């Protein structure tokens, strides 16, 4: 019988040895287990000390998209009413805003331009700096199924050799922070070879001439030098 994909593949973190199960307080160079009462008292005391010494706006609070609306509401109440600061943010904006901005500038909307079904039906999937098997088991299950049933090809670029890297047809390990370089070099190479859809680019993409000019420095030789990947790769 079928089970929920998240429940089937995304449960191991619950019993992970890396999971913190009790508050820890730093003593010297070590973290020592403490009670919740002691930990909360220490945090409250230190926050008040910082506030008294440096002012209200020396404090900042970051809430989480993994908590409920009510809990996020309480966090902003804590910041604004208890510590009298408007320095309150959410990890969703901090983490996802750059991606949303980039997508808006490139595809015209700050959201995914495709669907999980599109990825599953593709002939080739490229994963860059991510591990869907850990972070998005539903998507990973679709890729695994497409590999098994349709022979879908998978390329993974990462610093880590995780499960999806083990399953890949090609795993590349570029220097840290150079994914942009090799991806841009691949785009230039494809255009140089005439493998791009000229009609689509002409009708659906703005500033094509500027983009082509931007690609010029990104030769395969330049990418090899910057990323550590061979031209043959």
Predicted regions, residues:
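Catalytic alpha/large subunits of respiratory electron-transfer oxidoreductases
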Residues: 1-233
């Amino acid at each position: 019988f079928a089970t929920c994909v998240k429940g089937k593949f995304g449960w191991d973190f619950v019993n992970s040895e890396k999971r913190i199960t009790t508050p820890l307080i730093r003593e010297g160079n070590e973290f020592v287990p403490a009670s919740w009462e002691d930990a909360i008292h220490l945090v409250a005391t230190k926050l008040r000390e910082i506030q008294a010494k440096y002012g209200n706006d020396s404090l900042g609070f970051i809430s989480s998209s993994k908590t409920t609306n009510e809990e996020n509401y309480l966090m902003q109440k804590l910041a604004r009413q208890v510590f009298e600061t408007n320095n309150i943010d959410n990890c969703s904006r901090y983490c996802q805003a750059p991606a949303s901005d980039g997508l808006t500038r490139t595809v015209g909307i700050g959201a995914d331009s495709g669907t999980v079904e599109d990825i599953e039906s593709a002939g080739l999937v490229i994963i860059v700096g991510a591990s869907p098997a850990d972070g998005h088991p539903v998507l990973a299950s679709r890729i695994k199924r497409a590999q098994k049933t349709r022979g879908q090809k998978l390329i993974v670029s990462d610093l880590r050799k995780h499960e999806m890297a083990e399953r890949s047809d090609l795993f590349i390990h570029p220097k840290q922070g150079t994914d942009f370089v090799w991806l841009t070099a691949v785009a230039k190479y494809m255009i140089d070879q005439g493998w791009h859809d000229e009609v689509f680019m002409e009708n659906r993409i703005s500033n094509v001439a500027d983009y082509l000019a931007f690609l010029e420095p990104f030769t395969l030789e330049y990418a090899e030098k910057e990323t550590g990947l061979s031209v043959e790769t």
